[in-house]
């Protein structure tokens, strides 16, 4: 590897540390405290400490190192990852029925992420600022207000992008992990016997010793791997090698050292259970630790917010969410986007959660169920990809799936016990998002099918118009068409009411490909249907934003020139009414009407000059 390549790899690896590992990197703030807080019927006992440390270590090895970094990350769509990408890959070579099943699994996984994303900023920032209770116990009433202030500032700066402050993420998080390692070493040196917990026999002994209670306690151990999905979701930003390199050289050693350092401290001083992370530090370092812990949790929250923006854009482009305003905050990096509606909706939800739960320990009960649910779904989808796409031996795939589920299902089942004490929150949020996504997709399909079910043949209509043309007016008319072989509603209504046709007519279809990006060579396909009719199909990836001016620039390069200020864009605007249907479908229809009314209009969605747009209304019953 050349010197330049090595330097580039180091830079990308450092950047990955700053973004990808924020969530899992701040888990030591609260994980061991929740494991040994006494809620499971046992306190800070030697067997319990060793058992939990062994479970945490082997979860980091089996789930993060083996499952995600070695297996799941093999499944990429042009380098991109994430649960919806995995869903798309899994459904490529399957039957229609199987594809529908896999789509449901993928949407549930995406919905779980929306449920989790509300909790992550709240529990992360709260757990950091709770260090104030160690420094100055009399200021404990300020924890919630300070957490809200920090998160308010974080959400407020989203519209300006993270390009400038993002450059600080990597060095801050690198410093954070080095501090984790140093504090952990300090604790281990005081009680080296804690390293015995590296032996998996202590995890087995934990289950034998504490029996039924040990299974429920798995729900707390899961806190150590929250954020593991980010490794796969952010693969497109950094690549597989930098993410893997960052984990094995910096993140994993730092996490293991810190967890074992906390364990060593608790064996010497069981009273440190009130906050073993901060009490691991010397007194003089508490204030600096509070500051850098807060910065680290803000960065972890930023990574989650950016993740929900990316997931939302992908869902919009794939047709699972209604179009909404997406603002690019960087001219250099297409992945840096801002979605105002999602940003402020998430902010309100996070503030409500902080005010309602007040303490990170209360929120810990709500955390984990969405994470483990997504892990189960990821196992199913990734093994489907291995069998269908990679053509692995079915017995090997079955063995891998059984092995993965032997880990995932107990973790998920253990978290079901949390539903009453807080787990209902991510489940409810996830259910709402699942209903919204399936409603938009299915009702949109019903609407388009109803609009086109009585349509005449496009070829026959064009032939008729060429044979007996109506009055022709100068200029070019562009009719937006959702389907290539269907007569656009706007064209039919223009002929019906205005009884004129432009000299040149272009039927434009904007299509989303099953890929993050589409090369410019494949951007535009032009087909001349008659002397005065053309069909243009423009293809975009789900990480790209369609732009009509760019489309016609590409058309001009291929011989079909259009001047935007001499072109009229005709679009149909549907006024929807809910027809006779069962009560539950009426409710879904009304939800769709609400989503439709608040959706971004096509001219704004496709960046068409508003003074060149003509909308023709039509009423459609759904």
Swiss-Prot record:
Annotated keywords: Cell inner membrane, Cell membrane, Ion transport, Membrane, Potassium, Potassium transport, Symport, Transmembrane, Transmembrane helix, Transport
Reaction equations catalysed: K(+)(in) + H(+)(in) = K(+)(out) + H(+)(out)
Keyword Signal: no
GO cellular component: plasma membrane
Main location: membrane
Transmembrane portions of the chain: 12-32, 49-69, 101-121, 134-154, 163-183, 213-233, 247-267, 276-296, 337-357, 363-383, 395-415, 419-439
InterPro entries the UniProt entry points to: K+_transporter, K_trans_C, K_trans_N, Kup
Entry's Gene Ontology molecular function annotations: potassium ion transmembrane transporter activity; symporter activity
Keyword Ubl conjugation recorded: no
Topology within the bilayer: Multi-pass membrane protein
NCBIfam families for the chain: kup, PRK10745.1
Name used for this protein in its record: Low affinity potassium transport system protein Kup
Organism from which the protein derives: Enterobacter sp. (strain 638)
Gene name, Swiss-Prot/TrEMBL: kup
């Amino acid at each position: 590897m050349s010197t330049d390549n090595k330097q580039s790899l180091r830079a990308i690896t450092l950047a990955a540390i700053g973004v990808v590992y924020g969530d899992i990197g701040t888990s030591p703030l609260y994980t061991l405290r929740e494991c040994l807080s006494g809620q499971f019927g046992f306190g800070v006992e030697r067997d319990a400490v060793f058992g939990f440390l062994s479970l945490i270590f082997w979860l980091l090895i089996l789930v993060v190192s083996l499952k995600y970094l070695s297996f799941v990350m093999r499944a990429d769509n042009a380098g991109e990852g994430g649960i919806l990408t995995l869903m798309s890959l899994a459904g490529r070579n399957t039957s229609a029925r199987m594809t529908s099943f896999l789509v449901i699994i993928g949407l549930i996984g995406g919905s779980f992420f929306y449920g989790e994303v509300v909790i992550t900023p709240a529990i992360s920032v709260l757990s950091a600022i709770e260090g104030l209770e160690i420094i100055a116990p009399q200021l404990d009433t300020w924890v919630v207000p300070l957490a809200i202030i920090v998160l308010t500032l974080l959400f407020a700066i989203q519209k300006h992008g993270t390009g400038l402050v993002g450059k600080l993420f990597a060095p801050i998080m690198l410093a954070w992990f080095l501090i984790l390692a140093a504090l952990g070493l300090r604790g281990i040196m005081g009680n080296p016997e804690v390293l015995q917990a590296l032996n998996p026999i202590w995890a087995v002994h934990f289950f034998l010793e504490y029996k039924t209670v040990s299974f429920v306690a798995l729900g707390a151990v899961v806190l150590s791997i929250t954020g593991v999905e980010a490794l796969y979701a952010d693969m497109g930003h950094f690549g597989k090698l930098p993410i893997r390199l960052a984990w094995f050289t910096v993140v994993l050693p730092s996490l293991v050292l810190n967890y074992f350092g906390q364990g060593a401290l608790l064996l010497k001083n069981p009273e440190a259970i009130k906050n073993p992370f901060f009490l691991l530090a010397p007194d003089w370092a508490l204030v600096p630790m509070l500051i850098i812990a807060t910065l680290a949790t803000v960065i972890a929250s930023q990574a989650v917010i950016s993740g929900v923006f990316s997931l939302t854009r992908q869902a919009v482009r794939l047709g699972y969410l209604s179009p909404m305003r997406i603002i690019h905050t960087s001219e250099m990096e297409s992945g840096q986007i801002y979605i105002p509606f999602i940003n402020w909706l998430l902010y309100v939800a996070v503030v409500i959660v902080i005010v309602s739960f007040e303490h990170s320990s209360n929120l810990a009960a709500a955390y984990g169920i969405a994470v483990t649910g997504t892990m189960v779904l990821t196992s199913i989808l990734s093994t489907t990809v291995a069998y269908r796409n990679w053509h692995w031996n079915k017995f090997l795939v079955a063995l891998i799936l059984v092995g993965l589920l032997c880990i995932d299902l107990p973790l998920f089942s253990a978290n079901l016990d949390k539903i009453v004490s807080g787990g209902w929150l991510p489940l409810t949020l996830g259910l709402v998002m699942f209903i919204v996504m399936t409603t938009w997709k299915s009702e949109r399909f019903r609407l388009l099918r109803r609009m086109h079910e009585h349509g005449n043949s496009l070829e026959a209509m064009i032939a008729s118009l060429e044979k007996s043309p109506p009055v022709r007016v100068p200029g070019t008319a562009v009719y937006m068409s959702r389907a290539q072989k269907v007569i656009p509603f706007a064209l039919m209504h223009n002929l019906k009411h205005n009884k004129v046709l432009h000299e040149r007519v272009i039927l434009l279809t904007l299509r989303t490909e099953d890929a993050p990006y589409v090369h410019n060579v494949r951007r535009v396909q032009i087909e001349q249907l008659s002397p005065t009719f053309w069909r243009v199909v423009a293809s975009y990836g789900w990480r790209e934003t369609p732009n009509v001016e760019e489309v016609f620039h590409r058309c001009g390069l291929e011989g079909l020139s259009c001047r935007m200020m001499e072109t009229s864009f005709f679009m149909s605007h549907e006024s929807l009414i809910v027809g006779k249907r069962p009560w539950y479908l009426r409710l879904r229809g009304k939800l769709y009407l609400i989503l439709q009314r608040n959706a971004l209009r096509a001219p704004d969605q496709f960046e068409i000059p508003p003074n060149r747009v003509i909308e023709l209304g039509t009423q459609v019953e759904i």
